């Protein structure tokens, strides 16, 4: 078996020493990403009892798990992913690609006439390590998530999405400002400092794009 590269060994060492990884294990959370969302939800008071929350690209389920934990037994949490995800109590999971009409039809049938209050996306591509490849892939996923929110989020609702700072991210944020009354950029404490990731939060979805 070939030995791990120095960069791989360094990543593993950092990963297992990470306080958020340790906390996730101790508290039974599926990923350290849950603590990024926990901070964002609390800071901006995004959740209220009875809300309908949609989590795009939800696997392995850390964000959906955090939303359900924060809301208790009220409201609905709907998770979508092209990857399979083990069941989570209180989370409705739709396995499929939300770009496909058949999957969207299933989603719409699940919700009926119930409006969506909050759309979340922590989606990211498998990283190649090359910005010229990774950044366009990331922006493509972000565009898909924004289109989903355009179509399914209720007026006045909120949209929270992960972005990589780089080519296209400023233009994307400008597009968010056309769609939402208030747009804020956040970098939660659980985000690694060297990571280009930030979270864009749009609140107060406009009835019409400006």
Swiss-Prot record:
S-adenosyl-L-methionine binds at residues 61, 63, 81, 97, 122. Its EC number is 2.1.1.166. It catalyses: uridine(2552) in 23S rRNA + S-adenosyl-L-methionine = 2'-O-methyluridine(2552) in 23S rRNA + S-adenosyl-L-homocysteine + H(+). GO terms for cellular component: cytoplasm. GO terms for molecular function: rRNA (uridine-2'-O-)-methyltransferase activity. It comes from the Bacteria. InterPro entries: RNA_methyltr_RlmE, RNA_MeTrfase_FtsJ_dom, rRNA-MeTfrase_E, SAM-dependent_MTases_sf. SUPFAM superfamilies: S-adenosyl-L-methionine-dependent methyltransferases. Pfam families: FtsJ. It is found in: Cytoplasm. The active site is at residue 162. Keywords: Cytoplasm, Methyltransferase, rRNA processing, S-adenosyl-L-methionine, Transferase. Belongs to the class I-like SAM-binding methyltransferase superfamily. RNA methyltransferase RlmE family. Specifically methylates the uridine in position 2552 of 23S rRNA at the 2'-O position of the ribose in the fully assembled 50S ribosomal subunit. This is Ribosomal RNA large subunit methyltransferase E. It comes from Xanthomonas oryzae pv. oryzae (strain KACC10331 / KXO85). The gene is rlmE.
């Amino acid at each position: 078996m070939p030995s791990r590269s120095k960069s791989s060994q360094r990543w593993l060492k950092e990963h297992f020493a990470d306080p958020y990884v340790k906390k996730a294990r101790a508290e039974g959370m599926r990923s350290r990403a849950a603590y990024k969302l926990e901070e964002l939800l609390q800071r901006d008071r995004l959740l209220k009892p009875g809300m309908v929350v949609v989590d795009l690209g939800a696997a392995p389920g850390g964000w959906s798990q955090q939303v359900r934990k924060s809301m208790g037994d009220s409201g609905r949490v709907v998770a979508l992913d092209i990857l399979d995800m083990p069941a989570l109590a209180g989370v409705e999971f739709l396995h499929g690609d939300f770009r496909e009409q058949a999957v969207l039809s299933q989603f719409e049938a699940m919700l009926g006439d119930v409006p969506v209050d909050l759309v979340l996306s922590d989606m990211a591509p498998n990283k190649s390590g090359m910005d010229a490849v990774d950044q366009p892939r990331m922006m493509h996923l972000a565009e898909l998530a924004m289109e989903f929110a355009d179509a399914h989020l209720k007026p006045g609702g909120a949209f929270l999405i992960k972005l990589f700072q780089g080519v296209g991210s400023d233009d994307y944020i400008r597009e968010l400002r056309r769609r939402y009354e208030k747009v804020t950029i956040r970098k939660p404490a659980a985000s690694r400092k060297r990571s280009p990731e930030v979270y864009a939060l749009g609140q107060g979805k406009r009835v019409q794009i400006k």
